[in-house]
Amino acid sequence: MTLPSLRLKANAERRLRAGHLWVYSNEVDVAATPLNAFAAGDQAVLEMANGKPLGIVALSPNNLICGRLISRDTKHVLDKSLLVHRINIALSLRERLFDKPFYRLVYGDSDLLPGLVVDRFGDVLVVQLASAAMELRKDEVLAALLQVLKPAAVLWKNDSSARDAEGLERYVANAYGEVPDWVALEENGVRFEAPVLAGQKTGWFYDHRMNRARLAPYVQGKRVLDLFSYIGGWGIQAAAFGASEVMCVDASAFALDGVERNAALNGVAEKVACVEGDVFEALRELKAADERFDVVIADPPAFIKRKKDLKNGEAAYRRLNEQAMRLLSKDGILVSASCSMHLPENDLQDILIGSARHLDRNIQLLERGGQGPDHPVHLAIPETRYIKSLTCRLLPNG
């Protein structure tokens, strides 16, 4: 197969040669190789300004990120063979890390499969196709997954906003077999059922696995507040780890049904209470009622989805963490997390310092965490690092 060329401007290859995989539209020599000559999902040979090939790129010509490097070898295009090879490499890491088949199997760019995310729930796979190139080759993606893993069922969970930029429709559909509404998983020895069809993202957030494991020594015999609880990833584990009482707060009645379901599954239903409503309003009401907690977990959805949201997003993180601190006992633990890629950890740390000072409390950083190793960070692609988790101790100033 002979592929067309996509030529870069002079010196535009530096970031790519340093290891990054993304090509921006303003880096392309459109006089030599017009982007409008390509269709979304096409592949091309990426060339330096002097014509030297850099590899194979998959194209999204109408996007700012107009291409993603698939291979640095021009003989290796995105096809079933390459997918099988890369999925096997991804699988070998996860099987080394985990003794049970519950993990993120493929994490996009970090696993050298840009636009592809696969979460594994035993013999059920939930797949997100976030690029035109992957959508165009979804039959090959499915065939590769069936060959490598032989699952009982595969779900296309393609309802992410990331597809909008690619001009792709959102949909959720069975790709293979029959996917149940809820699937079983185990994390840190705690059992869960996740709503893969109707739930958020793939139905579960494996990225905080290691951070949730760190809860154990802090929650035994303690009263715990889990904010933005979803189906209880943090809260149910806190209860299973020995918390005396857990309150889960979420705006979604459906999510809180999941909390109750998972509490019952682990025999901790009598220790878990659910509060449905806006988290900020719930925080105000809890403060007005003079409620106090030994541990507060604040793991909100991304307040900063784009760079232009930075100012408002930082204000939201500040408001959330300060209100959470107001509910802590004198020697309390705050787990403050962020999944906003655009919020650096140092900025989250500064927010916590400022909030603690505003409340005249001392703050100690006990542990810092990131995403688990099934979400490996590609060190040349800082955008692949997004999870921050800071476990802090709040003390009176005196």
Label each PLM-derived region with a short phrase:
Residues 293-323:
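Mobile active-site "lid"/loop adjacent to the S-adenosyl-L-methionine
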Residues 1-120:
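Non-catalytic accessory regions of SAM-dependent methyltransferases
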Residues 254-297:
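S-adenosyl-L-methionine
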Residues 231-244:
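Conserved SAM-binding loop of SAM-dependent methyltransferases across substrates and taxa
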Residues 221-230:
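Conserved class I S-adenosyl-L-methionine
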Residues 245-250:
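Conserved SAM-binding motif I beta-strand of class I
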Residues 106-119, 135-205:
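Non-catalytic substrate-recognition/targeting regions of SAM-dependent transferases
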Residues 319, 333-398:
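C-terminal catalytic and target-recognition region of SAM-dependent MTase-like enzymes
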